[in-house]
Each structure stands twice: as C-alpha cells, then as structure tokens.
C-alpha cells in the first residue's frame, strides 16, 4: 500500500453506467476536446427545440429528437441541441468540461451559449460581497473635498504636501483592496463551477514557462527510476495492473530537482485557500503530497473508480496535466467523469498546463481510457478536517498513512 490517498476502484454497490461509445467524431465535428459521448437518455427538460422543431445532424439534414428506448442510444453529434437545432443547456450529454471552460474560443465560435454559473450578491443569499465603496474610493472623496479649499488657504506649500501624502495613501489602499489573481480565479470561476457542475477545468494555469519546468522535473523523475507501479488500497484477487496501469511517485516539492513541482503546489494551494469556506461545509486544513503519475503508453489506463468512496477525508481532487501536443484520437488517455445522477459524461483531454478540479467522493466516478503515448499528470487531494479526523478514529490509520497529510502552504510574507 503506497498511501491512504490511493483511489480505490468502485465496488459493485455503485451503479455501473453504460460503457462509452467507441466511435470517434470526425475532425470537423470535434469540439472542446469531446471525442466521444456516453450513450445515455436525453432529458426533455434540458433541451429546447429550435424554431423548426427538429434537430439537425450537422450537415443540414433534419432528424427527429433521439429518445431513449433502451439503455444505449446513438452518440450525439454536432448540431444537436445548441448549434442549428436548438439551445444546449448546461450539462446536456456533451461533457461538463465543454461547458465550464469559459476561456475556450472554440465553444463561442461554434455558437453554443451555455448558461454560465454566476455569483449571487450576499443580500440574495450568495457569497459575493454587497457593492460598496472601497477604502480607496472613500479616501479619494476626502481628498477631493480637501482640494476644494486649497485656494483659500494661505499655506499653499503645506497643502500640496498633504495632498501628495494623501495620494500615496490612496494608491496604497487601492492596491490592498484589489483581489489577487488566485482570489479572482477562485471566487469568480472555480467556486461557481464547483457549485454548479462539481467539475472545473482551467487551461493555461501556470503558463508555458513554469509548466515546461514542471514537465522537465517530472520527466527527470521518470528517467531517474523514481516512479513505482501504482497500488490499490484494498487487497484484491484481481492483478493491480488490470485495474490501474500508472507509475507514481509521491513528492512534497522541496526535494532536489522538484522545486518547480513545489511552485505548482503553491499555486494550487493559493487557489484552494481562497475557495475555503465557500464550498459547502468543508473545512480544508491540509492536503496530500503531490502524486506524480505516468502512464507509459502501452495501452493501459485506470478502470472506473471513486477516489474517496468510504469517507477517508479527501474532498477535492486537483489534477494538473503535462502533455504537450496531445491528440486523444491518436494517443488515447482521455479522462471521463460520470457525475452521479446525471445522464452526462465529462470528457477531459489531458492537455498541457490544464488544471482539473472535482469532488473526490461518490459524486464523480471517473476512469482513464487506455493511453498509447507517455501521459503525465500530477494529482493532489485536499482534506476536510472533520471527515479526516473521523477516518483516523474509525480506521486507526497506520503511521505511514498518518504521515501523508501536509499543511496547505501559506503565501510568502512580503519583505
């Protein structure tokens, strides 16, 4: 057993959704990294027909709306519910990832207009602060009043110096009032997406330079023989390699040759820290070490599973991908998430510099499709303090397991 933070395969008590469609979309039909669809029934309440009352097959030929007469149905194709055949509502059978990646230009270019999650004002029961004047705005008003009486003051020099010092104070207050980049990302994007979808995708998380350094360190771990076959928590008669085919290493981020991985974790910590208190009743006080994972490209994947099916304390899963020029039609390795109770599948391409966040519990069963090229990812799980403490008491975690949790890094104190 590597760690208590190894994802455990789904047991038979969980409902098994139908398998994915093997048919791939044509290049002209592919969008947002969605290469295949889960054959599942459509919900009439989610789809509004277009003016013609029929959905187009993407080539101008009308077709009737698909109905679920069996447990499997034809895969949805381009044009159905959101292109020329009607409006696609959030989480229609197309993949949550396609709808939560707000920055993607391909989605906007092809006419889909999903309903984006929006924050509510505090007075309406949301978490967004009520609009009010910032401290620097009040300071500027005071300055304006002071300047109106300067002409009547015989001590012009002292008034100018006072105004100058007030201006500096105003600038300082303005800088303090403006939210940081991680805070804006957390409050304006990640928190609404997690509440609305339970899944969040953020592209260009670190940027090409730092992301490239992280990739170089991960490749060095692989070629240095630091990776070991991933293990399962439960003792099963099934060979582990038939369930998961990755090789892993646990990294804290301060080891020699892992500084950039540590920087990645600090960036993720900063975002999650700003999400704390806004994602339900979770009290996030720590996380696991970073799990560096590599699928060697020999056609292995990871069967459908839930990261935390039995309440071991993990509440949020964060995965950072490092695969440049990845093409799922050629390389495979697609991550599929099957949100519980919804007839949808989120198809996530493991693209370079992409951060994926989702709930770790039974709400998000997921699997990694077989990979035919070297596939890298770094995963970290964040703990809910109450559930983690209960798990320690219930399962009497071994000493090796207790040592896995590390505190969420704090921002450096400015000097």
Swiss-Prot record:
Q: Where is this region: Beta(2)beta(3) 'finger-like' loop?
A: 233-243
Alphabetized, the UniProt keywords read: Dioxygenase, Iron, Metal-binding, Nucleus, Oxidoreductase, Phosphoprotein, Ubl conjugation, Vitamin C
Q: Where in the cell is it found?
A: Nucleus
Q: Where is the composition biased (Low complexity)?
A: 1-18, 49-73, 159-170
Which residues lie in Basic and acidic residues bias regions? 115-126
Tissue occurrence: Expressed in heart, kidney, brain, liver, skeletal muscle, lung and spleen. Highest level in testis.
> How does the cofactor bind to this protein, according to its record?
Binds 1 Fe(2+) ion per subunit.
For 2-oxoglutarate, which residues are the binding ones? 375
Q: What is its main location?
A: nucleus
**What PTMs does it carry?**
Ubiquitinated by SIAH1 and/or SIAH2 in response to the unfolded protein response (UPR), leading to its degradation.
Tell me what this protein is called. Prolyl hydroxylase EGLN2
Per the record, the gene is Egln2
């Amino acid at each position: 057993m590597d760690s208590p933070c190894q994802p455990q395969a789904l047991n038979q008590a969980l409902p098994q959704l139908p398998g994915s469609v093997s048919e791939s979309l044509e290049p002209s039909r592919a969008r947002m990294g969605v290469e295949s669809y889960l054959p599942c029934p459509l919900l009439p309440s989610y789809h509004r027909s277009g003016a013609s009352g029929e959905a187009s097959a993407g080539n101008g030929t009308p077709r009737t709306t698909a109905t679920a007469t069996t447990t499997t149905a034809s895969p949805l194709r381009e044009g159905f519910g959101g292109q020329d055949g009607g409006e696609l509502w959030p989480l229609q059978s197309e993949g949550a990832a396609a709808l939560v990646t707000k920055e993607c230009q391909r989605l906007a270019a092809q006419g889909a207009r999903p309903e984006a999650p929006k924050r509510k004002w505090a007075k309406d029961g949301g978490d967004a602060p009520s609009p009010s004047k910032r401290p620097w705005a009040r300071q500027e008003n005071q300055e304006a009043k002071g300047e109106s009486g300067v002409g009547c003051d015989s001590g012009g020099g002292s008034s100018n110096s006072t105004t100058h010092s007030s201006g500096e104070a105003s600038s300082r207050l303005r800088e303090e009032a403006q939210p940081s980049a991680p805070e804006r990302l957390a409050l304006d994007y990640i928190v609404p997406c997690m509440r609305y979808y339970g899944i969040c995708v953020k592209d260009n998380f670190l940027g090409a330079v730092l992301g490239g350094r992280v990739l170089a360190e991960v490749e060095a771990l692989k070629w240095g023989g630091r990776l070991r076959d991933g293990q399962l928590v439960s003792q099963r008669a099934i060979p582990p390699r038939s369930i998961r085919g990755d090789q892993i290493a646990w990294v804290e981020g301060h080891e020699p040759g892992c500084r950039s991985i540590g920087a990645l974790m600090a960036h993720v910590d900063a975002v999650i820290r700003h999400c704390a208190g806004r994602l339900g009743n979770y009290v996030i006080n720590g996380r696991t070490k970073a799990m560096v994972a590599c699928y060697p490209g020999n056609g292995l994947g990871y069967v459908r599973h839930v990261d935390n099916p039995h309440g071991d304390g993990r509440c949020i899963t964060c995965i950072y991908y490092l695969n440049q020029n990845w093409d799922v039609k050629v390389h495979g390795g697609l991550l599929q998430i099957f949100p519980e109770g919804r007839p949808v599948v989120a198809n996530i391409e493991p693209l370079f510099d992409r951060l994926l966040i989702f709930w770790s519990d039974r709400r998000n069963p997921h699997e990694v499709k077989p990979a035919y090229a070297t596939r890298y990812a770094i995963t970290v799980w964040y703990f809910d303090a109450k559930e983690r403490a209960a798990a320690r008491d219930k399962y009497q975690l071994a000493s090796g397991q207790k040592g896995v949790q590390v505190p969420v890094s704090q921002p450096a104190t400015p000097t």
